[in-house]
Amino acid sequence: MQEQYRPEEIESKVQLHWDEKRTFEVTEDESKEKYYCLSMLPYPSGRLHMGHVRNYTIGDVIARYQRMLGKNVLQPIGWDAFGLPAEGAAVKNNTAPAPWTYDNIAYMKNQLKMLGFGYDWSRELATCTPEYYRWEQKFFTELYKKGLVYKKTSAVNWCPNDQTVLANEQVIDGCCWRCDTKVERKEIPQWFIKITAYADELLNDLDKLDHWPDTVKTMQRNWIGRSEGVEITFNVNDYDNTLTVYTTRPDTFMGCTYLAVAAGHPLAQKAAENNPELAAFIDECRNTKVAEAEMATMEKKGVDTGFKAVHPLTGEEIPVWAANFVLMEYGTGAVMAVPGHDQRDYEFASKYGLNIKPVILAADGSEPDLSQQALTEKGVLFNSGEFNGLDHEAAFNAIADKLTAMGVGERKVNYRLRDWGVSRQRYWGAPIPMVTLEDGTVMPTPDDQLPVILPEDVVMDGITSPIKADPEWAKTTVNGMPALRETDTFDTFMESSWYYARYTCPEYKEGMLDSKAANYWLPVDIYIGGIEHAIMHLLYFRFFHKLMRDAGMVNSDEPAKQLLCQGMVLADAFYYVGENGERNWVSPVDAIVERDEKGRIVKAKDAAGHELVYTGMSKMSKSKNNGIDPQVMVERYGADTVRLFMMFASPADMTLEWQESGVEGANRFLKRVWKLVYEHTAKGDVAALNVDALTEDQKALRRDVHKTIAKVTDDIGRRQTFNTAIAAIMELMNKLAKAPTDGEQDRALMQEALLAVVRMLNPFTPHICFTLWQELKGEGDIDNAPWPVADEKAMVEDSTLVVVQVNGKVRAKITVPVDATEEQVRERAGQKHLVAKYLDGVTVRKVIYVPGKLLNLVVG
């Protein structure tokens, strides 16, 4: 064994061994308990970042630990390979998205191997290959036949100059990112999947997910947004149709003083024919892209349509306004406004001088003060005719019942969730498998024409999708009749909604899934990824699983038993102000810093001499130039060091602060482990451990070893507090470093301890542990070694620590058997030099003994 720890030598050797032996390839084995450990698959952007490294290290630690427990562990990896960034990169680099993507996959695959992740590479998949997306296309056509897919017009961001649809992130300050033309809202036909048909099940089954974070479940509950309320119909004077609104607060209905409709509502459109101000307002709304998240904070604007609706219960006429806070795609595109008891309605009414009518008493029974804000709490009704004096629940029911009896109201359960629009007017995605015949009939692409293959050898102009620009691509025939293919492609969330299931049978050619393999491995035992995916990906992931279940492919209700959301990776961020006042962000690698005595940064500059402003720790990002390249760190310290730091620096679900001093600390620890094994093995062969012949000190050390095994097992397996597991191993290492190694049983005990330490560290730092296991002559490869088991007998405290005082002052601490008598304790204390010197030539007048804890000798 070489004396120095050289990770660059051992890591490549061990990785080659894993490749050649196909160590992590698995097949279904009914005789073994399975464990499916999955990290969210990466987008092949070109390089791994520290967020990836953290995510995949957590997964690998869990997978390796479960493998050592004797389970049949599946840990696959693949590539979420379609998406918009590839189109931009292709234009920039004068290539096509496919070669750019495949080059990135090859590069990042090497990076993953360099980090020593134990993946089953035989199951690797890339979602941009026809072998993958053909089954997604087939499944879509089956959903269409079941009535779960439909087409309707929907608003998109449209650049009139480029004549193309823009993704939300391509709209900068209301303008096209390429040509700066003002973006318009345009209605175009798009495909939808009926996720709303599963809304109740998606909501109710959250209660089955005991091992998902409550935050994620709450976000999904709110996103699905189930509410119970009443749908109310208003007659409108001089208008051919009625207006329908939905409210969850029918108890406030007597306080409704106006209605608001979306700018795109037919009533607003009709009113605009003779109202230039309203027409201009509608145009303004059409060209304003509003994300739902921004609705709460944006300025509320509106224009009176001139129409008057009739309140069904009071008979009063109330105005109908067009307002920018009502969206056509939500509900009916119309809302009732109760400004006395809804803050948004209150602000709008105050701005435009509309009537504010209170109908709910304050908590103390007085009339509410509405001079500053609305009263939004529930309470007892007044100013409400026959409903006066009713509390919230009674009023809800009484008003709902009356409206229903009059034929102008209906109790309804509503959902905030909208059907999933899966059409994208992009090129780099899976083609939607639908065709249109010459007579306008729309139908699924026949099975014998699947997959509809996306051409990869294309020229990108950065404006139009190549399959939209080439009229020949769309031409096909169905049953001998000319037809045109759909030129939209799938939302890339489609591919990432079922990849976890395809990993169970990536080579299967008879269908989307091999049910036997899928049902052996599924559900996923632990799924690891960022909380930013809580409502989009993780909802579609659950939805797709239920669709596949109802198609008879899987027999479980949910795709993953446990979800672990890892925290973000933070790093120091610095900038200097340029000549034009702009911020120039400087990488922390290039910052020369001064720190105070507590290690805090007080001053910083870069190599060019710029004084740097330190903004603290923030998420690693390109925008702040504070990302740390994992490859540089691996080349400097080794993969094991980077992995160990990642798992030790913070609990897995909390943010991790990147500190190179911490990386250096992890590296020093691994060097200490190496050194201890080197010194131990250099002394030659070891005798068998005789536990019955151990001294008290040896028993105490062995007790520490087995207590550490018990703690680390619990920390990794049950608690998933990996940082505390590592801390416990480090504490044990400190004790082992001080332990005597001269005697035969000292060395035998050290052998047992080091074999345990190396196995406990193996999930975290597999390369060094693989090597040290061989040096310690462990049986076989460590990859097939069992997890160490704590010896219950060894952990029993058969000795205890007694404090020895002379005249009340502590003079020594002695270890004695737990069943030692007072005489034996006194005898042992007298043998201690630190005690004996105070007893020399004096008389012991009194002895105070607290069994197992304290011996106080009073002398004089």
From Swiss-Prot:
GO terms for biological process: leucyl-tRNA aminoacylation. It comes from the Bacteria. A motif ('KMSKS' region) lies at residues 619-623. A motif ('HIGH' region) lies at residues 42-52. The keyword Protein biosynthesis applies. ATP binds at K622. The keyword Aminoacyl-tRNA synthetase applies. Its EC number is 6.1.1.4. It is an enzyme of class 6 (ligase). GO terms for molecular function: aminoacyl-tRNA deacylase activity; ATP binding; leucine-tRNA ligase activity. It is found in: Cytoplasm. Keywords: Aminoacyl-tRNA synthetase, ATP-binding, Cytoplasm, Ligase, Nucleotide-binding, Protein biosynthesis. Signal peptide: none annotated. It catalyses: tRNA(Leu) + L-leucine + ATP = L-leucyl-tRNA(Leu) + AMP + diphosphate. One of its GO terms (cellular component) is cytosol. Belongs to the class-I aminoacyl-tRNA synthetase family. This is Leucine--tRNA ligase. It comes from Escherichia coli O6:K15:H31 (strain 536 / UPEC).
